[in-house]
């Protein structure tokens, strides 16, 4: 493993592994619609012994589409640099052959919009501009976008450009696309070592802030005074982004942030993954409970991918 004492490596490992742990911890209670149902399973937002965190024939530590697609994007960046055609092909390989999946056999949890795009769009028809298809506002682009924020973290214009183009591979919707920009910008701030209390003011001053959809601007402007009871737990990108940011800003350590995100119920694996990725980038690998890491399926492969992302990011920056 890369030396976790190296601050940048520690943060990148934290982001990738935190994402995967948040995913598998949320998996057993995905689609429970009420927070009290999550509490019934986990117990007051604690995490039960990991051996019981299973769902059907999926064992503890089994991650879903959130992490598998994130790993596909990461490996594409490692293999080809930024290449949306290769990203598309790796997503197809996951969807139909189980590439990067937890059991290395088949995909799990693929969204209908993503499946439709992989079946019908074709690698030669990937859009490069937002056309705002209202049917493509799900969180499938947000859940996988983390590696962009890692690789390009020092170049904010590249974070924006690459986040947009990578999201458009499957999601041609302004909120779905710009949610990835917000998330990856905060990942960038985390890897740069900024204090999270300064994130929002820094973001409001970014030149691209004016381009954001109004719904995202409203979310960010109200973030620090948001009533948790008003937050929706649907699988749409805006709601998932809000849950992740509220959970991140309202807590002081990674495990509490992930538990809070899962505690909102709904699309819990994605909420846990997105929150875990950001919190991991901020607090680092050493902040993840050891038993969470030890239970993660394909742990060595995931850590190796994170190491390779660290190597690429270090060279770029």
Regions found by a protein language model. Give the residues of each.
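Structured, active/binding-site neighborhoods that engage oxygen-rich ligands
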Residues: 1-317
